[in-house]
Amino acid sequence: ICKTDLLSDLVGEFPELQGVLGGYFAEAQGFDKDICLAVSEHYLPIGTDSQIPKKPYSIALALSDKIDSLVGFFGINLKPTSSKDPYALRRLAIGMIKIILENRKTIKLRDLINYSLQLYNEQNLNFNLENTSTDLVVFLKDRFKNYMKEKNVRQDIIESSTSSYNIDDILKIYKKANTLNNMISKDIGLDVIFIYKRASNILIDEINKNNLEISDIADPGLFKNDFEKKLYKKIHDIRKE
């Protein structure tokens, strides 16, 4: 139902009505009002200041349609280049990112991509699963970086946050990056950086002087005071969040 309006002469004459007209068609056929709204909104967002879908059916349909298009184009190797994006795939990717972040949804992007690839292959469109998935993840990651840059997140924070976490949970990455971005401009943020650099330099000096190997696994049995135990517990509590 969400694409039937593409066959109408009215949408052929006025392409900007696609989706909107589909919502009216769905309403005329007796579909639930939330379904009609989802059909009318599934192309959103269509611009920088465009509204985004907010209701569950609308979010689900908008994301499904966008990931289906992205997987399809990447599957047949019609990817955007640095100078050309004839199918507006960057806009689709940014649209997905905005829908997820502004609705505060935790969605595993890689699972969506792989499921869409599976559906294509079931229709005998045998895309290269690994290459298509990898290329699309990289593409979405780049769009996500651009989104954060437009939100005035520092470039070093963008790079560190996207390299430290899996792209599957962009909401988690964005929240952490935004928190760090806000904190780092304050006195407490500068203090944290100073402490981290000091500790890091001490470790590097000890490694170089004594030819040590540093493990990333702490041994609580070696702790000598309560400060170490409390710090260890706090780090683990934060990691669970």
Sequence positions of predicted segments:
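Amphipathic alpha-helical "coupling" segments that flank catalytic cores
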Residues: 1-241
